A protein has these predicted regions:
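Aromatic-anchored segments of alpha-helical transmembrane domains
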Residues: 19-25, 161-168
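Transmembrane alpha-helix boundary and packing residues in multipass membrane permease domains
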Residues: 50, 99, 140-144, 171
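Transmembrane-helix signature of polytopic, membrane-embedded enzymes
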Residues: 110-121, 137-166, 185
Length: 189
């Protein structure tokens, strides 16, 4: 497991950063409500996400979908009940990366006897956790690369600058359902 102080320190810093980012994401969305343009599953973000409930909850059967859900989520996808199709212009890459968090939200939702429809507040919060996780992962990987070439101080300054002076904070905390933060983590790896 963790056999030296450097690894333990890195582990603690990573957990603290992840906890901070999750807190900031939850706090940012605490008063935004659901099914509006400020929510985690609205418009493009819902279009990326729709693969998950379609696959794991509804089995691509549109007859079980709540009425007007596509409109309530900002038209990020379209439910065509006449032809039994869910239409989205986005690929499934973001949904694949959100899958572990979706499954966790589904288990929590069913356990707490909430609606397991894929769009209740627990699923919205899962998107915040996913964004925070991939922000932390990307920063960790870039930090590890920098530590190989530079000293710890420079690596820390660069990673803090990335969060504070680029759009990473915005996409990792505010717009957690957009593809940007997931792409960042993948490029960092």
């Amino acid at each position: 497991m963790l056999n030296n102080w450097k690894e333990i320190r890195l582990f603690v810093i990573t957990i603290c950063a992840l906890s901070l980012f999750v807190f900031l994401g939850f706090n940012r969305h605490s008063k935004t409500g659901y099914f509006n343009y400020r929510s985690q599953l609205w418009a493009d973000k819902a279009g990326y996400y729709v693969y998950l409930p379609a696959t794991f909850i509804y089995g691509y059967d549109t007859s079980g979908w709540p009425d007007s859900l596509d409109i309530k989520t900002g038209d990020g996808f379209h439910i065509d009940k006449a032809s039994d199709k869910i239409i989205t212009k986005y690929s499934c890459g973001v949904a694949i990366l959100q899958l572990p968090f979706f499954l966790g939200a589904y288990l929590l939702s069913v356990r707490n006897e909430n609606s397991g429809d894929g769009f209740n507040p627990i699923f919205h919060k899962a998107i915040d956790v996913a964004g925070a996780f991939y922000l932390t992962l990307g920063l960790l990987l870039i930090g590890l690369i920098l530590i190989r070439k530079f000293n710890n101080t420079i690596a820390l300054i660069v990673t803090l600058t990335l969060v504070g002076c680029t759009n990473l904070y915005y996409y990792g905390i505010d717009e957690t359902g957009m593809s940007h933060i997931y792409s960042f983590a993948l490029f960092a790896s």
